[in-house]
Amino acid sequence: MVGIIGKKLGMTTVFDETGNAIAVTVVEAGPCTVMQIRDNEKDGYSAIQLGYGAVKEKHLKKPQIGQFKKANLEPKKYLKEFRMDDASSYTVGQELKADIFQAGDFIDVSSLSKGRGFAGVMKRHNYDGGPMSHGSNFRRRAGSIGCNSYPARVWKGKGMPGHMGNTLTTIQNLKVVEIRPDDNLIMIKGAIPGAINSIVKLTSAVKKRNKKKNSMN
């Protein structure tokens, strides 16, 4: 599975050949460095670990510092693994850039969604709420959360107030509209999870085949 780590820069509008406006999200993809290679014999699965973003050594834990020194690589702030059938074609220290994708490819994008803090049921679960008429005290309340004698408990998964957002969210089958390799920019059709400057993980779509198979597949 081809993939790369990037940073969400924001949204803008581009135009296709026929003049149609397309809302796109701009992602700075890479450059990423192959920090570690995992194989089936030693680790039980095949994958590569990519590093993205510079960081000072004083901000790292000792096991991380040891990993970077052993590989003789510059420390990276963000590390993510990408599983694949065979990782033998990659070497530690190899650099991956935005051009691993091409315009027309479909990708899956994963990132932490925006945190909304403590939210009620109307905002968190899209409940209708109660009547807003004169004399009503129900308004934005959740209402009943279960019966009395049976089941005499709250059903698992019942929508209730609580912390909203800041969860790992994946949107599938987003189309790559444009690639700018010189600037390491990928323009993705539509919106993606996370706030501006959020770290995102881009992988080839698992439910759609891209036009051209990449060597990482």
Swiss-Prot record:
The keyword Ribosomal protein applies. Signal peptide: none annotated. InterPro entries: Ribosomal_uL3, Ribosomal_uL3_bac/org-type, Ribosomal_uL3_CS, Transl_B-barrel_sf. Pfam families: Ribosomal_L3. Keywords: Ribonucleoprotein, Ribosomal protein, RNA-binding, rRNA-binding. SUPFAM superfamilies: Translation proteins (SSF50447). Transmembrane segments: none annotated. GO terms for biological process: translation. GO terms for cellular component: cytosolic large ribosomal subunit. One of its GO terms (molecular function) is structural constituent of ribosome. Coiled coil: none annotated. Belongs to the universal ribosomal protein uL3 family. One of the primary rRNA binding proteins, it binds directly near the 3'-end of the 23S rRNA, where it nucleates assembly of the 50S subunit. HAMAP family: Ribosomal_uL3_B. NCBIfam families: L3_bact (TIGR03625). Part of the 50S ribosomal subunit. Forms a cluster with proteins L14 and L19. This is Large ribosomal subunit protein uL3. The gene is rplC.
